[in-house]
Amino acid sequence: MALSWLQRVELALFAAAFLCGAVAAAAMTRTQGSFSGRCPLYGVATLNGSSLALSRPSAPSLCYFVAGASGLLALYCLLLLLFWIYSSCIEDSHRGAIGLRIALAISAIAVFLVLVSACILRFGTRSLCNSIISLNTTISCSEAQKIPWTPPGTALQFYSNLHNAETSSWVNLVLWCVVLVLQVVQWKSEATPYRPLERGDPEWSSETDALVGSRLSHS
């Protein structure tokens, strides 16, 4: 059975969500790796001579959550894409009511996780940048990437990576919201399927009586 146009749009959105999730997870992992495993989100920077240092990082689990949530959702999108491609080519591509309800629940959870991750990235990056700018060594976080950090090699392109992760997360949130809306539309359309009138239905009897009555009146 061929995929419906709603399912095709949904698969295209899943492909885009996979890319966004993969970019966010990779950018967050690179950022944490550049700080030797410490999480810079909501961190506090200090001056160490002429260089910067991350004196008070956040708990590593905070960055693990952002990278893990983005990575798991990207993996889910990839597996779902492969499953639907296989189903459309080999088996029946129709999704039952139970499968649609499960997909709705997963999409709702995904919207929540991506929203939380995007907010953590937004406010965590802003807190770190405010800490850096308050030292009066630079006027922006992007310029702070050019300043040496202690230990050497720390914070390589940290702001660019955090910005990419945040942007990808917000785009991912929009994609998941659209996916959720499409799935709700499919669920409602399958919940009230079209059924032609049959003998014995109240509507059939009323329409038949009206037609017979009008013919008798004309005769």
Curated annotation (Swiss-Prot):
InterPro entries: TMEM179B
Native source organism of the sequence: Homo sapiens (Human)
Keyword Mitochondrion: no
Protein family per UniProt: Belongs to the TMEM179 family.
Subcellular location: Membrane
Transmembrane stretches, start-end: 9-29, 65-85, 96-116, 167-187
Any one of the GO CC terms: ficolin-1-rich granule membrane
Protein name: Transmembrane protein 179B
Keywords: Membrane, Phosphoprotein, Transmembrane, Transmembrane helix
Bilayer topology annotation: Multi-pass membrane protein
Keyword Glycosyltransferase: no
Annotated positions of the Phosphoserine modification: 206, 214
Primary localization class, coarse: membrane
Disordered, as annotated region: 198-219
